[in-house]
Amino acid sequence: MRPDGRKNDELRPIKIEKNFIKNADGSVLIELGNTRVICTASIENKVPPFLKDQKKGWITAEYGMLPRSTPVRMLRESTSGRVGGRTHEIQRLIGRTLRAVVDLEKLGERTIWIDCDVIEADGGTRTASITGGYIALVEAVKKAMNAGMITENPIKDSIAAISVGIVLGEPRLDLCYAEDSQAEVDMNIVMTGSGKFIEIQGTAEIYPFSKENLLQLLSLAEKGIREIIRVINNLD
């Protein structure tokens, strides 16, 4: 029995509220169960120095957690004066997965910043950030196209992400924190709406896993991501 009574192949309830931050070019509040993340997209009419005069854009991300997004208050990373290794890894993950579905030349010499702020953490914050970041990106691009800043839609495909793992010997979809903290195997999967993989992060936390286990987890993730993509496609 899972902590919240779900079946092993069942997602947590998903809620998505677009235009959550009025000042942003695109924004969303995404909820998967008790995990809640605010994602915004901001367009700048400049690119990093390494892309100067290359006539293409860039997408980058920042990720953070509120001090009381966790049961015990955590320190803000700004207090320590540096970004931690986990945060840096997640920021790079969000940026590169979103770039995989964007034609950067059609974006023009612009940078889109994706900011993901976790306001409540109960497992799957990085995957929720990727999915929410994609929705915020789409909204920002729509706004830019309506304003005539971008003439062609640079987004080539939809994207979503989910966690899977083996807990107490059972493959499970969309792990909450209680499951994630005791998982024997933990994976984060990112896929496109057309069914292609962008990222597969998998780790044996306790025991090595077999090829059969891997295929079971990939199949679970694919099922969950298809369901999330359907939710995204049905948004107003």
Curated annotation (Swiss-Prot):
Catalysed reactions listed for this entry: tRNA(n+1) + phosphate = tRNA(n) + a ribonucleoside 5'-diphosphate
Name recorded for this polypeptide: Ribonuclease PH
CDD domains (UniProt xref): RNase_PH_bact (cd11362)
GO MF, any single term: tRNA nucleotidyltransferase activity
Quaternary structure, from the entry: Homohexameric ring arranged as a trimer of dimers.
InterPro entries: ExoRNase_PH_dom1 (IPR001247), ExoRNase_PH_dom2 (IPR015847), ExoRNase_PH_dom2_sf (IPR036345), PNPase/RNase_PH_dom_sf (IPR027408), Ribosomal_Su5_D2-typ_SF (IPR020568), RNase_PH (IPR050080), RNase_PH_bac-type (IPR002381)
Matches recorded under Pfam families: RNase_PH (PF01138), RNase_PH_C (PF03725)
Keyword Protein biosynthesis: no
Gene3D superfamilies to which the protein is assigned, alphabetical: GHMP Kinase, N-terminal domain
Example GO biological process: tRNA processing
Provenance organism: Thermodesulfovibrio yellowstonii (strain ATCC 51303 / DSM 11347 / YP87)
Transmembrane segment boundaries: none
Role played: Phosphorolytic 3'-5' exoribonuclease that plays an important role in tRNA 3'-end maturation. Removes nucleotide residues following the 3'-CCA terminus of tRNAs; can also add nucleotides to the ends of RNA molecules by using nucleoside diphosphates as substrates, but this may not be physiologically important. Probably plays a role in initiation of 16S rRNA degradation (leading to ribosome degradation) during starvation.
EC number per UniProt: 2.7.7.56
UniProt cross-references to HAMAP family, sorted A to Z: RNase_PH
Alphabetical keyword list: Nucleotidyltransferase, RNA-binding, rRNA processing, Transferase, tRNA processing, tRNA-binding
Family: Belongs to the RNase PH family.
NCBIfam families: RNasePH
List of residues binding phosphate: 86, 124-126
